[in-house]
């Protein structure tokens, strides 16, 4: 903090015995101390001149941090006393006294002075034309070095700085406490909540996809429904090969979630996944009537569906059964059973089913024409015991 020097000067009198001034004009005493100049009142030019006045001088040292530094700085300041007479047309200096401020305020101790600073006397230097001996100045000083809260010159700036520092400390204090509290709360919540995240499959099912891809969370919720509960027929792809291939690609993209959702999908569906696949692969009436005279079978066409579903583990048993059954000749009972099954359905009913299937299966990729023909031939040549086995289950879907 800056230090301030306060000096109280008490001037008693100026004595010069046996001296008479030639001019009768009034005189006064001027004091220059700590870069400040003060004057006493005017008195008659007759010695002794009794003044009996007090003066106060103040000076702030902003760079000083201790009284020793202040004492060193006081050596560079000058203290001067002037005895002036107001002679016309101007003023005239009769005598003067000057010294550095440190020696003036803190003089060396002497044997004659019993009370330092209380009663002091100094001899002034006279001018050339002054008649008589040098006048003597009687005074007393009292000096104090204080800690200054704000500089006198920059008082308002110093007050603004103090206000800003106080407001800044008030703002930073609660902010630090607020920042620390959420961290502690989060650590407590993590320590308490971590044991419950692991064993719960519903939380894992709901929260893990939203963390990886939160924008597509609605798609994940839509996958709860069984994919093959209702039979959908597409004119371009009647046997659902596109659905199976799309399902296999989706299982490759999300291998972590398909194993977890498989049990839930089986619980929602009426039949097992194998039965649903068989239901989807059942032929359409138009295909059966169109393929009364099937073309010669080609073994190259039947290997393509097997290669398409080779990456999906769940469909390996079904594909092996279909390829083994393709070698058996078509049974005449298939045509009769299919005709009996599809006779009750009207043309309008089939048209609605086809429109609904087309609207649902539009984003799927269309298969080549050869694959669809090969699939129709494979379904046409399927043995009859598969249809008899799932006949009762198929009626409930319509």
UniProtKB/Swiss-Prot annotation:
Any matching Pfam family: SPATA6
Keyword flag Phosphoprotein: yes
Keyword Phosphoprotein among record annotations: yes
GO cellular component, one term: sperm head-tail coupling apparatus
Region (Disordered): 170-215
GO terms assigned for molecular function: myosin light chain binding
Record-annotated membrane-spanning stretches: none
Cross-referenced InterPro entries: SPATA6_fam, SPATA6_N
GO BP, sorted A to Z: spermatogenesis
Keyword vocabulary terms for this entry: Phosphoprotein
Residues with the Phosphoserine modification: 269, 272
Family to which this protein belongs: Belongs to the SPATA6 family.
Name listed for the protein in its UniProt record: Spermatogenesis associated 6-like protein
């Amino acid at each position: 903090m800056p230090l301030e020097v306060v000096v109280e000067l008490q001037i008693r009198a100026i004595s010069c015995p046996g001296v008479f001034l030639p001019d009768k004009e009034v005189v006064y005493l001027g004091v220059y101390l700590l870069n400040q100049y003060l004057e006493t009142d005017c008195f008659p030019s007759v010695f002794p001149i009794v003044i009996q006045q007090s003066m106060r001088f103040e000076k702030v040292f902003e760079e000083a941090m201790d009284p020793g530094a202040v004492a060193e700085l006081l050596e560079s300041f000058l203290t001067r006393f002037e005895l002036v007479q107001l002679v016309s047309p101007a003023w005239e200096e009769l005598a003067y006294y000057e010294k550095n401020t440190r020696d003036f305020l803190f003089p060396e101790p002497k044997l004659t002075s019993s009370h330092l600073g209380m009663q002091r006397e100094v001899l002034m230097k006279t001018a050339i034309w002054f008649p008589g001996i040098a006048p003597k100045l009687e005074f007393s000083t009292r000096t104090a070095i204080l800690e200054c809260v704000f500089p006198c010159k920059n008082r308002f700036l110093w007050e603004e700085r103090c206000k800003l520092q106080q407001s800044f400390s008030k703002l930073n204090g609660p902010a630090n406490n607020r920042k620390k509290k959420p961290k502690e709360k989060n650590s407590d919540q993590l320590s308490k909540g971590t044991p419950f995240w692991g064993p719960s499959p519903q939380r894992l099912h709901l929260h893990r996809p939203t963390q990886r891809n939160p924008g597509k969370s609605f798609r994940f919720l839509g996958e709860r429904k069984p994919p093959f509960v209702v039979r959908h027929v597409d004119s371009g792809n009647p046997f659902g090969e596109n659905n199976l291939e799309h399902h296999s690609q989706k299982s490759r993209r999300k291998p972590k979630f398909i194993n977890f959702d498989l049990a839930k999908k089986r619980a929602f569906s009426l039949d097992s996944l194998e039965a649903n696949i068989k239901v989807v692969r059942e032929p359409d009436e138009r295909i059966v009537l169109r393929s009364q005279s099937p073309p010669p079978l080609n073994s190259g066409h039947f290997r393509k569906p097997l290669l398409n579903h080779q990456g999906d583990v769940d469909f390996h048993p079904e594909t092996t059964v279909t390829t083994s059954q393709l070698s058996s000749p078509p049974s005449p009972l298939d045509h009769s059973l299919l005709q009996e099954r599809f006779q009750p359905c009207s043309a309008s009913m089939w048209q609605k089913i086809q429109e609904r299937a087309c609207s649902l299966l539009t984003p799927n990729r269309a298969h080549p024409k050869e694959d669809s023909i090969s699939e129709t031939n494979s379904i046409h040549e399927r043995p009859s015991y598969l249809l008899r086995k799932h006949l009762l289950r198929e009626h409930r879907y319509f």
